[in-house]
Amino acid sequence: MKKVLIKIGGRSASDEAALAALADEMAALQNEYSFFFVHGGGAEVTRVSSVFGLEAVFENGVRKTSPEEMDVVDMVLGGKMNKYIVRLFSKSGLKSVGISGADGSIFTGKAVAEGSRTGKVDATNPELLDTLAESGYL
């Protein structure tokens, strides 16, 4: 089965109608392709960070995530956004599971700056993703 990676930004992930339409298309093709789905959610991270009194810092258009803000990133991207998408995809008949790059050491990397949790990926481990795909999960 061919593998397809789909990456969307947070704005698209927040558009329920567009995301539902994408899920329906993916469901129609799920017997031909193994889909891997990656989502953003930066605006929601910024919003929730402000609730906790944390200010989002950007350098050259890239978020500079502090250790404190990393907790918010995990909550928003690995929790709220992730489960919202899993539930929506499940409604379209897709076997969905939500994980993060930290799970199964899918991605490992190095910080781009001292004291920042923003990094660059320097290694990938697809074992967990392959196991899920072999069992029919997105």
Regions found by a protein language model. Give the residues of each.
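Nucleotide/pyrophosphate-binding catalytic subdomain
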Residues: 1-138
